[in-house]
Amino acid sequence: MKIATTTADFAFYCKTDEERIRELHRAGFRYIDFSMYSFKPDSPYMQENWRDEVQKIKELAESLGMSFVQAHSQGGNPLSENEAEVDFLLKATLRSIEICQLLGIKNTVVHNGVAKGISKEEWFLKNKAFYQKLFPTMERCGVNVLCENSTRVNMGECYFINTGRDMREFVEYVAHPMIHACWDTGHANCEGSQYDEIMALGDELYAIHYNDNHGAKDDHVAPFLGRLNHDEVMCALIDVGFGGYFTLECDTSLVTYNLWTEPRRHFDGGARELKLCEPQLFMQRHIESMMYETAKWMLDSYGIFDE
């Protein structure tokens, strides 16, 4: 199994994707999960010359001996009542699929929507309707769209596909040959044991987001910084016949001041300049190298590491 990680690891520390890709390379990674989670209307990728921007990072990756192997499309809620928000979400998601085609990426994760007070059946119906808007672009570009599990920690009492069984049921309900599943180990760790849930996905498991936490919050930290049972997950991936990349998604291993899951405690320094609010690039570089070496050790331990 080959190791990949997300460009979001350096989203806080670097201004451009070129810089982020170089940092991944520096840490030992050769396979890239391209994050397109936070596009804005003024993003270079949403402009008329977007293909030129994509070509830049493609050529950079090739020059470094790296490959784009997975992606995460625009974040947002397709079931939001804010029409402008949903309109941009759709445009950015379609653009992300087109970008995947140019980069040679075959699988991108597209989050499903959530809404209060709707049943599982209504959720299936509304989210299928959103995915159907992606079908023509998916088919034209040859890019699979993957749904992803979440957790009650994030979704509260709202229905969501938090289990492998429900994910597979939804994939089969959508009934399109280019809709599959991505399993997030951190989200699952907030729910409990996950061996049976991974097995329930079966051959619909096309990608993973590997991250750790303490089971109470969606922390997205590096392996062994939380309580995830790594043997359980590794055995499940082997037993289910998973053939994708071992893709890390541990982009908040270091806590920024306003991190959405757990912001840093506030301190009013008065007239003094506060100097220790944010983690620094040199810290993330250490974390990144550690993540690669840890992932390699994990895969080597089970005899499944592949360069």
Protein language model regions, located:
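Histidine-acidic metal/acid-base catalytic patches
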Residues: M1-A4, C14-G28, I161-E307
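Active-site beta-loop-alpha junctions enriched in small/polar residues
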Residues: T6-A11, S35-F39, S73-G76, G113-A115, ...
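Active-site-proximal flexible loops/turns
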Residues: Y13, K40-D42, N77-L79, I118, ...
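Acidic (Asp/Glu)-rich catalytic clusters
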Residues: I21-G28, E48-Q70, L94-G104, F135-R140, ...
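Conserved beta-strand positions in the central sheet of alpha/beta enzyme cores
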Residues: D33, Q70, V109, L146, ...
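Glycine-rich, proline-tolerant flexible connector loops at the mouths of alpha/beta enzymes
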Residues: D33-K58, I118, M155
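Short glycine-enriched, charge-decorated loop/helix-capping segments at active-site entrances
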Residues: P44-E48, E83-V86, V221-L225
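Active-site acidic/histidine proton-transfer and metal-coordination neighborhood
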Residues: E59-S63, P78-W183, C190, D268-L274, ...
